[in-house]
Swiss-Prot record:
It holds the Pfam family DUF6792. This is Putative uncharacterized protein YvcB. The gene is yvcB. The lineage of its organism: Bacteria, Bacillati, Bacillota, Bacilli, Bacillales.
């Protein structure tokens, strides 16, 4: 085998990446015994998956060590808090087989699994504003290498899905940490992200273009993208990157925009033939509109980082909805005046922000709406929504457009009232603007309901399991969760699908229970024999030995009190010449043990036969598949 990738089988890679998600909470436990058990179970699952996919066992003497990011990064106070708190999760598998000269580290970085990751996906990838998870990925890789001994022979392989692909590709491009990188449905890196994170690249670009362009922003995007690709190719860090991408993956859909760059050998797959993906939908949005949206959002990145999405919206529009609602919900003119007086400075500042920010915010919304019609049409064309949903969505988009016109109209009045010092009227204008904003939010809620199924279809295209099913369909295999299914023909030609993983678990766990029952019966028989049969024989033998001693040595018992009492004291000085004992051993009825044991063994045999019948039935259904029989015999 040498030191080539033990997990070179692509299905093994995909299933291990998927498996790692299942262990996130277990590996995060603060109880050492729970983490230890989780690592043991994880190793057993690794061996099972390898067997199911390759039909071979990982050698028993192949040592597997598990390291987690929770141990090496999150709990390491010597690492910067921004890195420790980035939301990154990863697991490293260290594989050692000295006889076969195998010493390798498999780094599985976890993809988008919770809201923190998805907000990072949007702002970190689309805007290129954050590199915390890149730092965490690099830190975990280095710490795992150190834990594995970091010998010259150590090979390091990176595996990742979604956001994890972005992180591991960044580490490979900038630091060259891996011998191989494999990503599935990965988030791609973008120009801003690379320029902000890789100082060497930034200096290279400045030197390369300073003679011709005033700054980086003035370099034509396609020209800059090609130069960045060439830079990393010349660096020699891209040839060992492999990406498996679904045509239906939403991240693939947007990767043609926002100056994303896809590195490595890309292998495409169609994981859902009933839809056409969203790539052509996104490709229909003009590049200048995408960059306009990107530039607008970039302006408010600090507000997002500080106060989240609400902070971003408030900063982008200038409108303080909470303040306006507080004034509107106060009863009585005098009380309203009191609230205004109390918040006079806040109102004054809000007026200034609205005057400054609202026009560009409306321009941003117009750009979104301008592209919404073609996007909705294409969603229907690509199979994500039906005609009824399309009509409802377009109706709500029309309502949003009307609300925006209302906002624009009230904004003109607002500016006019400010010019003439009519501040209360201006406040009334802002109140009406807020009503229009609430109307937009109501339409967005309806849109959320109408597009829920479409979004689920789109998100499903991001799934690892869907990718596994697409790659394995022709072989008769499919996947649900961490289980493998096999579909085949019975002897009568009927199509049958069996959950092999579950069947093997039932068989092996069932046989283990039967073996435990047999051990318990054997222990019961042994205890019964020791405590009843053997004890009776031992005590009987002790009595017989005592009798023989008395009969053979009567003089020893001449002055025994029992004999003197029996003979009477008138014969005190008579000689005892003979003792004759007539023994008879009367005992209580012993338990009918043989019948009990026979019944227990009968029940055990019936259970064993039942479990074996499950296996034999499945093997008979798919009698040409020798692999199925091997799986039943597999011991993790």
């Amino acid at each position: 085998m040498g030191n080539k990738n033990v997990f070179e089988n692509e299905n093994v890679k995909l299933r291990l990446i998927d498996l790692e998600y299942d262990y996130k909470q277990k590996f995060a436990s603060t109880i050492a015994s729970e983490v230890k058990k989780a690592k043991k179970d994880f190793e057993a699952d690794i061996r099972r998956i390898y067997k199911e996919e390759t039909h071979h066992d990982l050698p028993e003497n192949m040592k597997i060590e598990i390291y987690t990011s929770n141990e090496l990064v999150n709990q390491n106070t010597s690492i910067q808090s921004s890195t420790r708190e980035s939301g990154y999760d990863g697991t490293a598998i260290h594989i050692i087989d000295e006889k076969k000269h195998i010493d390798q580290l498999q780094i599985i970085s976890e993809g988008s699994a919770d809201n923190k990751d998805w907000s990072y996906n949007f702002f970190g990838l689309f805007l290129g504003i954050d590199h915390s998870q890149y730092e965490a990925t690099k830190e975990f890789t280095n710490k795992a290498k150190k834990a594995a001994g970091n010998s010259e022979d150590l090979k390091t392989f990176a595996l990742g899905h979604s956001l994890a692909n972005n992180n591991q590709v960044m580490v490979q491009l900038i630091d060259g940490e891996y011998d191989e990188v494999y990503g599935v449905n990965g988030a791609q890196v973008n120009i801003d992200q690379l320029l902000e994170t890789d100082e060497s690249l930034y200096r290279y670009v400045i030197r390369k273009f300073s003679y011709k362009y005033e700054d980086i922003d003035s370099i034509p995007p396609e020209k800059l993208k090609k130069e960045i690709q060439k830079y990393y190719e010349d660096k020699g860090v891209t040839t060992n990157i492999t990406q498996r991408i679904s045509k239906d993956d939403p991240l693939y859909g947007v990767s043609g925009k926002a100056d994303f760059i896809t590195f490595g050998d890309v292998k495409m797959a169609d994981t859902n033939t009933s839809v056409k993906g969203i790539r052509n939908i996104m490709d229909g949005v003009p590049d200048e509109d995408v960059r306009s949206i990107q530039k607008f959002l970039q302006k408010y990145k600090d507000d997002y980082e500080k106060d989240g999405l609400n902070g971003f919206i408030k900063a982008a529009s200038g409108i303080d909805i909470d303040l306006i609602e507080k004034v509107k919900n106060t009863d009585g003119a005098l009380k309203k005046v009191s609230v205004l007086y109390e918040h006079f400075d806040d109102v004054k500042q809000m007026y200034g922000r609205i005057k400054e920010e609202l026009p560009s915010f409306l321009g941003f919304l117009h750009t979104l709406l301008r592209n919404s019609g073609p996007v909705v049409d294409q969603l229907a064309e690509n199979g994500y929504i039906d005609e009824t949903q399309k009509k409802v969505i377009k109706k709500e988009l029309t309502n949003i457009n009307a609300s925006m016109r209302g906002i624009e109209s009230r904004y003109e009045h607002f500016i006019d009232h400010l010019k003439h010092g009519q501040f209360m009227q201006a406040l009334k204008d802002v109140g009406e603007i807020v009503d229009y904003v609430k109307s937009i939010l109501s339409s967005l809620k309806t849109l959320d309901t109408e597009t829920k199924d479409a979004l689920k279809l789109i998100v499903d295209g991001h799934s690892i399991v869907q990718m596994l099913n697409a790659l394995s369909k022709e072989k008769g295999f499919s996947y649900k969760g961490s289980d493998i299914y096999f579909t085949g023909k019975s002897g009568s030609g009927e199509t049958i699908q069996v959950n092999l993983s579950s069947a093997v678990r039932i068989y092996q766990n069932g046989m283990k229970i039967v073996e435990d029952m047999e051990d318990a019966i054997s222990k019961y028989q042994k205890v019964y024999s020791q405590e009843i049969d053997e004890d009776f024989i031992d005590k009987k033998q002790a009595i017989i030995t005592a009798i023989h001693h008395m009969e053979e040595n009567p003089s020893h018992y001449a002055f025994d009190l029992q004999f003197r009492l029996a003979a009477g004291f008138s014969h005190t000085f008579d000689k005892l010449e003979k003792i004759s004992v007539h023994e008879s051993f009367h005992t209580g009825a012993l338990p009918a043990n043989d019948g009990i044991v026979a019944e227990l063994k009968k029940q055990t045999t019936e259970k064993r036969d039942f479990i074996k019948n499950i296996r034999e039935s499945i093997e008979k259904l798919f009698e040409k598949e020798e692999m199925i029989s091997q799986l039943f015999d597999f011991q993790s």
